[in-house]
Amino acid sequence: MDSEALVKEGLRVPAEVLDAVALAQKFQDPDWTAKGERRAMVALERLTTLWINTGTLCNITCRNCYIESSPTNDRLAYMTAAEAITFLDEAKALSETEEIGFTGGEPFLNPEFLIMLEAALDRGFSVLVLTNAMLPMQRPHIKAGLLALNKRFGKQLTLRVSLDHFTQELHEVERGAATWSKTLEGIDWLAANGIGIAIAGRTCWHEDDATARAGYAALIAVHGWSVTPSDRKQLVLLPEMDAGYDGPEITTKCWDILHKSPSDMMCASSRMVVKRKGADRPVVLPCTLLPYDTAFEMGETLTEAARADGGMFAIGAVKLCHKNCAKFCVLGGGSCS
């Protein structure tokens, strides 16, 4: 019985129970919303960015990590270099992909990460690495590897460092005590050695965009980092995930109402490869935001993923049947690229 039916039956039900019932009905049917409206979907227009998740293990535990990375979370296993290279070669053969994104967890914890990083660069891709720039990246052999790769590939490589606020206080609210100085140390080292950097912040601090960018601009100026705060690729401000999200589902009518296009969504131009703990092979997912929901597995190759049909897919198109699709991408305007 849905929440409207409970009311019609004249039952006295607490408001919080009605809210819970309504929430449970959302994002259930791949094709229809809880209100019976046709669910929106997004087709892959061109595989511009291929994300490779290197594993969910991380050196720290953040307050609100969308993928729940931590020193103990290994739900996504370490991708091996051989597995990653298989997808790099397939992406190269498809002749569409321009960028490889590596994410985790913390990519520099993966013992084979430098091998796969070199393989991506050697195949001519631009490469974006999402990192916290802390101790895993600052180990001597990792620094030596980064210096060698930067010397060979230069502007192909960018490390985007998570700096959740431009103040130590709020950054450490999210990341924990003693994370600020080590992160700044990592960014300073990258900048001093001419390695491409970008910054990823958050929008959960009740600041408008201009205020946030001005705050980061002041910090960037003090350190002399080569980052342009007004450039939304160089300073990315990400909306929050919310497990209890109770906002609207996205219907086919929403594109016109919101003045947005399916082409603007991350899944119109990207896919992510993950390897689940205990799995024999990696699988392809629509994007970086759906790491654990097996209903969104599209196949074991990029070619299979392009033909995924049934359930959450329609001949490769992705049905927006997840709260992260609504809150982060469509309504939040977020993108990991």
What kind of region is each of these model predictions?
Residues 95-101, 153-163, 178-247:
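Conserved C-terminal portion of the radical SAM core fold
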